[in-house]
Amino acid sequence: MTQLATNEAVVGDFDNVTLHDGDVTYKLSHKGENFWVQRESPNSSGASGLESVTRPVSLTTGSHHMQAYWSPTGRGREVVILPFMYLIEEQRWIPRAAGLLQPPGNRSEPPGRWNGNCIRCHTTHGVPRKGPSGYDSQVAEFGIGCEACHGPGHRHVTRMKDRVVAADDDLAIINPSRLSHQRASQICGQCHSVWYITTGEHIDFLQNGFRYRPGDDLAKARLHDFDADDGYRFWSDGMARVSATEYNGLRESACYKQGKMSCLSCHQMHQADDDSRPSAEWANDQLQVEATGNRACVQCHQEYQDQTVLTAHTHHAPASSGSNCVNCHMPHTAYGLLKAIRSHQIEIPIVRVSRETGRPMACNLCHLDKTMAWTDQHLADWYGTEKAELTADEQSIAASLLWAVRGDAGQRALLAWHMGWKPAQDISGTDWIGPYLSLLLDDRYDAVRFIASRSLRGIPGYEKFQYDFVAPQSARRAGSARAMNIWETRSAKARQENDRAVLIDAAGQIQMDTVRRLLLLRDDRDIGLLE
């Protein structure tokens, strides 16, 4: 969410930090409650010396994973983003472009983007108010305030002041939990979705903000059904592949269309008084205590409370990750915030669908060392699913490697993340993963390199591995070679314990001829996963 840039809100290091963006220098400083950015660039007139402009930091966006910063342009209330963002867990500045999965060199960030776009969901009732000389933007509240979910509160405040109110009285406020599952979910869907509006509606938004209010029918305000050919935000069958599209997935799920599942089936916006988790832990996903593990699913699918019934269905031990409903039916096949995110379209894993869409198969996101043929056979044996027609590579090479080596940038990012995911590591082992993460350290996409380096440090032997994913290419390639060397110097015995599906031969050597062949097949089209 967007907040005023106060000491409490700002998490980035502004203690006399200097950052470089090509031939432009940014000097960050902090005094009292004020944060400043001094921008020095070559003189635009061609004269010697530098042009220097100092602006305050007025707004921040983000508080869990990364944080962006905005400064006024001097054109009304228009703001422009600092071309760097702060990674909170890593405690470091990176170029903003490097924090997004987009083609190298795509650095465009026009002034006014916050006013005309981000204001929609990172504030409460944001109104761009675009004019010929800039924006005169206004908000009811920065961040996600009460009225974002409960609607306008004036009548409620007046009513509660005027008289004693009985429990069954009309409180003149929207309570999402008392709405139908469709209308309750639409409140979340006003932001957690991809949608379209007409040109006329967009013009109206730029002057008046969106007219939708909680409790209204969102379907009358925005179009959520559209062609799946929408850049790269969707897999080819229409399933969302980026974050902030959870409502799109939910409304296509049978649990929503045929049942009464809503966002509130799993999530709660106010931490319960009896929730013993630290507030920060709850706030990360805002899950109900009752929604952890399989408890959210067995609210309806009550038969699976019986562990015998559960294991007969999953063919996995009851307490294992393979018996966790969401690992099979809501796998991490969406991308956002430099990580993989669970899909919110509940699906049944089918090999044929994975092949047709390119969406990684849930089974192979845990069993990283297994082939599509292995998965296909198990699903046929257990559930009677029709077997798919598989290529020779799909029958002999681990599916994870096909996605990580020859897949598009989005697939490579997802697999780099899963190679660092503990449930997958516990099942598949880690001795063979190092070479493939090393390979991704030389990927042309910043985000893929970052995720790969983070996963690599979670593998034994790489805990202290030093690598800068935004260093010059020569340094990155040297880092990739160092990472590969660490693996090659480990005992041959450890490397030989893996089967041929992960392309390690009987001598414990990587089958580089096959890896190079897969690299030649890589889907290297420019791809931008807009979050």
PLM feature spans:
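Primarily the internal scaffold of c-type cytochrome electron-transfer domains
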Residues: 1-73, 81-83, 88-106, 125-427, ...
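Intrinsic-disorder/low-complexity loop/linker signature
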Residues: 23, 32-33, 119, 499, ...
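Generic non-transmembrane alpha-helix signal with a bias for helix starts/N-cap capping motifs
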Residues: 248, 434, 518-519
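A gly/proline- and charged-residue-enriched helix-loop-helix capping module
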Residues: 98-101, 111-117, 123
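Extended alpha-helical scaffolding segments
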Residues: 413-510, 529-531
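Short, low-complexity, Pro/Ser/Thr/Gly-rich segments in the mature regions of secreted, periplasmic
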Residues: 516-531
